[in-house]
Amino acid sequence: MMVARALPAQDPMGLAVGTKAPGAMVQTLDGKRVDLSSFIGKGPVVLEFWALWCSNCKELEPQIQTLVKKYAGKVQFVAVAVSVNESPDRVHRYATKYGYTHQVLFDVTGAATDAYAVPATSYVVVVDRGGKIVYTGLGGDQQLEAAVQKGL
């Protein structure tokens, strides 16, 4: 039996700016379950929904890595790997190889992708300290520094 569920408010780019960031169960790369809501409301958060095979994500990577260093201790960065043609092990090897120092999670069931109405990989959501979405963007050419500033 299918149960209808209300979807969060969204625009063509996913969730609408101004809405409260939802939680969703994902897992760490070593298999522990974690809810995205555990990152929300404790300070600004940048969520990136990405994949190893995503060329736009690869284009965003240097910008994300620079911001992770620049805003260390001020902004939490969370990379949410989608499960399409991926595995936690492959994602872990990639994150290690490229020196990721921020949180990397795996969306095993697609719960986070659904909760955030992710239109495609390279989708970035910036959430302010109060848990409100202040930016959403898609593609390899995003002005992430300005987006992070909106979350501070």
What are these regions (language model features)?
Residues L7-S37:
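N-terminal "domain-start" segment that seeds a small globular fold
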Residues V46-L47, F77, V124:
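Hydrophobic beta-strand anchors of alpha/beta hydrolase catalytic cores
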Residues M1-R5:
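Bacterial N-terminal signal peptides
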Residues G41-K42, R93-T101, V108-G151:
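Thiol/disulfide oxidoreductase modules built on the thioredoxin-like
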Residues K58-Y98, V108-A115, A146:
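Structural microenvironment flanking redox-active thiols in thiol-disulfide oxidoreductases
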Residues L36-S55:
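Short active-site neighborhood of thiol/selenol oxidoreductases, capturing the structured segment around
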